[in-house]
Amino acid sequence: MSSSSQFKQLEKLGNGTYATVYKGLNKTTGVYVALKEVKLDSEEGTPSTAIREISLMKELKHENIVRLYDVIHTENKLTLVFEFMDNDLKKYMDSRTVGNTPRGLELNLVKYFQWQLLQGLAFCHENKILHRDLKPQNLLINKRGQLKLGDFGLARAFGIPVNTFSSEVVTLWYRAPDVLMGSRTYSTSIDIWSCGCILAEMITGKPLFPGTNDEEQLKLIFDIMGTPNESLWPSVTKLPKYNPNIQQRPPRDLRQVLQPHTKEPLDGNLMDFLHGLLQLNPDMRLSAKQALHHPWFAEYYHHAS
């Protein structure tokens, strides 16, 4: 285990849900790292579950997952030493905004990023680990165009705060309808929903469902995807936060929702793929592995694992 004296703390990169992040330098190797500092409650110390989850993350070695090199545990803080990445998908998309007009990414780049996102996700799901908090801010990109998933396991290690603060409302935009309606049976499908939201946002440059609270979030989802019912989603009416008085709406044509915001034509394969991710019923969503074998990715098959 490293000691904190091995690292020189450089500029602050940002504040996350759990931690403050700094750029750091490994004084021994000269390699840049990201230092994520989690302040510990002086009363309680580090929850053992957090340590357990974090040690799991150290075992997650994949080219599309940000490497966790080490964990430094001192009395009042936990410092996670991560591989340093130059950028994240949110900042990358923001940099393309012209004036106040968001711009989507070129579709070949969208496909390349989505492929890498699903490669990393499939690896984690095979290892029985959910992300739970996928959003453009924690998809990190380096100068070579490699995309890697960050913050894996942290949602589980530290718990997602229930009272979503304004800065954290972003997480809502990528949250699956089953979770919003109080489902406790989380499975890998919650990450797949987030992937669908991220895909739509890469195409248009704008979040697909930018709600400000759980109720509005569901309304935005149902306005586009249609209102769920028992025939489409058995047992939906039994979810704790299901609202029986919600106005029944048919689904809108997703291509018509997205096409005005991009110059490139959205083909049938892409739309079929997106529908496979954004199924209201979690049991109907594609798995990460199935998604990687979808015809939209045909040109990548020969690289597939």
Swiss-Prot record:
Q: Which gene encodes it?
A: PHO85
Is GTP-binding tagged as a keyword?
Answer: no
Q: How is its activity regulated?
A: Inhibited by the CDK inhibitor (CKI) PHO81 in response to phosphate starvation.
Chain positions with Phosphotyrosine modification = Y18
Q: What effect does gene inactivation have here?
A: Increases GCN4 level.
How does it get modified after it is made?
Answer: Phosphorylation of Tyr-18 seems to be important to discriminate between the different cyclin partners for binding.
Q: Where in the cell is it found?
A: Cytoplasm; Nucleus
User: Which reactions is this enzyme annotated as catalysing?
Assistant: L-seryl-[protein] + ATP = O-phospho-L-seryl-[protein] + ADP + H(+); L-threonyl-[protein] + ATP = O-phospho-L-threonyl-[protein] + ADP + H(+)
EC class name: transferase
* UniProt protein name: Cyclin-dependent protein kinase PHO85
Q: What does this protein do?
A: Cyclin-dependent protein kinase (CDK) catalytic subunit that regulates multiple cell cycle and metabolic processes in response to nutrient availability. Associates with different cyclins, that control kinase activity, substrate specificity and subcellular location of the kinase. Regulates metabolic processes when associated with PHO80 cyclin family members (PH080, PCL6, PCL7, PCL8 and PCL10), and cell cycle and morphogenesis processes when associated with PCL1,2 cyclin family members (PCL1, PCL2, CLG1, PCL5 and PCL9).
Provide GO CC annotations from the record: cellular bud neck; cyclin-dependent protein kinase holoenzyme complex; cytoplasm; nucleus; Pho85-Pho80 CDK-cyclin complex
Query: Which species is the source of this protein?
Result: Saccharomyces cerevisiae (strain ATCC 204508 / S288c) (Baker's yeast)
Q: Which residues bind ATP?
A: L13, G14, N15, G16, T17, Y18, A19, T20, V21, K36
Which keywords does UniProt give here? ATP-binding, Cytoplasm, Isopeptide bond, Kinase, Nucleotide-binding, Nucleus, Phosphoprotein, Serine/threonine-protein kinase, Transferase, Ubl conjugation
PANTHER family with a match to the protein in the record: CELL DIVISION PROTEIN KINASE (PTHR24056), CYCLIN-DEPENDENT KINASE 5 (PTHR24056:SF46)
Q: Which InterPro entries match?
A: CDK, Kinase-like_dom_sf, Prot_kinase_dom, Protein_kinase_ATP_BS, Ser/Thr_kinase_AS
